[in-house]
């Protein structure tokens, strides 16, 4: 009976979101023309990577997307990914994996918006940024990857002033066909622009067994860009806290051609272990051939462990083509 009530409440919630965002059509006014022709896009990121005592060429990402508008207030996006890094060998003779990343319908009306399907959850600033626009080849250790899940998200925007986002998702991650524990995960994020060029905000995530909080800021002025985040997560079952932060600065040396990047990051996976903290120091360069559509990104990161040093310094040279 409880499961049935949850199902009914979710259905009613989705209906209310759609009904709220769907504008009532005036009786004698025709809707503005909107192209419903699907648009095809994607990007490739082949790279050379030297990590510790191993070196290899690999395909970091290969993503292909189809997106389009259904009417003036509804659109969709479908994106799939082929990759070799960290992919399970299926079949065993091939290290290439295929999976879906974005699978959603987006609704918008004025300052309000909603997303239904599989999308990036509103939490970390760096995880919400596309890998095609990042200044570095890899996200920081505490962020690691863009979090995606299946559910519904609502947002409200005051242009150049405020962004408020909230989401309810299964909490099982992307490409999951069920929610075994029947418990939802909840996300909330607020971003404010007190002065031009400066965005500051915070976010919260709540799972059935863990919670997390994020403080974030980004500043852009002239040729300079600065971005920083602090994340703290708590696993209630083990009572372990994980913390991490990063601070990044980028300077455009030659407009539309060369950008220098530096980053310091730190990650402590457990406050129960006194010797597991790791600090990383990165220097890098972006060379733009045609903006983010065609560029080379090279960076080198030195990691320093709290006690025992490990051979895990990382050098990456990656080419990106986006269309």
PLM feature spans:
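N-terminal periplasmic/intermembrane-space "pro-region" immediately following the signal or transit peptide
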Residues: 1-6, 10-49, 92, 323
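Short, acidic Gly/Pro/Ser/Thr-rich loop/turn segments
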Residues: 2, 161, 173, 305
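Short hydrophobic/aromatic segments of transmembrane alpha-helices and their interfaces
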Residues: 10, 58, 145-146, 277, ...
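Outer membrane beta-barrel
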Residues: 29-171, 180-184, 191-198, 248-261, ...
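Outer-membrane beta-barrel pore domains
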Residues: 36, 45-53, 71, 88-96, ...
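A broad detector of the eukaryotic-type serine/threonine protein kinase catalytic domain
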Residues: 171-173, 233
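Short helix-to-loop capping/linker segments positioned immediately adjacent to catalytic or ligand/cofactor-binding
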Residues: 174-178, 188-189, 202-204, 237
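Interfacial loop-to-helix transition and helix-capping segments at the boundaries
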Residues: 177-183, 240-242
């Amino acid at each position: 009976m409880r499961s049935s009530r949850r199902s009914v409440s979710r259905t009613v919630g989705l209906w209310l979101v759609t009904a709220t965002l769907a504008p009532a059509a005036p009786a004698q006014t025709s809707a503005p023309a909107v192209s419903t022709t699907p648009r095809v896009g994607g990007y490739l990121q082949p790279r050379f990577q030297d990590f510790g005592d191993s070196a290899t060429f690999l395909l970091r990402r290969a993503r292909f997307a189809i997106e389009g508008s259904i009417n003036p207030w509804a659109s969709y996006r479908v994106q799939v990914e082929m990759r070799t890094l960290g992919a399970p060998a299926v079949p065993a003779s091939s290290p290439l994996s295929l999976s879906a990343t974005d699978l959603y319908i987006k609704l918008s009306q004025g300052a309000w918006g909603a997303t239904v399907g599989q999308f990036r959850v509103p939490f970390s600033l760096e995880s919400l940024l596309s890998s095609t626009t990042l200044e570095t080849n890899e996200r920081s250790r505490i962020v690691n990857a863009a979090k995606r899940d299946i559910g519904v998200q609502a947002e409200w925007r005051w242009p150049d002033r405020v962004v408020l986002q909230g989401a309810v998702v299964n909490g099982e991650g992307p490409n999951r066909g069920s929610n075994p524990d029947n418990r939802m995960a909840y996300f909330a994020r607020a971003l404010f622009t007190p002065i031009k060029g400066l965005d500051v905000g915070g976010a919260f995530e709540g799972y059935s067994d863990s919670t997390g909080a994020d403080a974030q800021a980004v500043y852009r002025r002239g040729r300079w860009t600065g971005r920083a985040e602090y994340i703290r997560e708590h696993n209630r079952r083990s009572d372990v806290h994980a913390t991490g932060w990063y601070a990044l600065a980028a300077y455009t040396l030659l407009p539309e051609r060369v950008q220098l990047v530096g980053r310091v990051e730190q990650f402590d996976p457990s406050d129960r272990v006194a010797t597991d903290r790791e600090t990383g120091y990165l220097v890098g360069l972006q060379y733009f051939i045609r903006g983010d559509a065609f560029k080379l990104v090279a960076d080198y990161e030195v990691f320093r462990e709290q006690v025992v040093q490990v051979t895990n310094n990382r050098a990456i040279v990656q080419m990106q083509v986006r269309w």
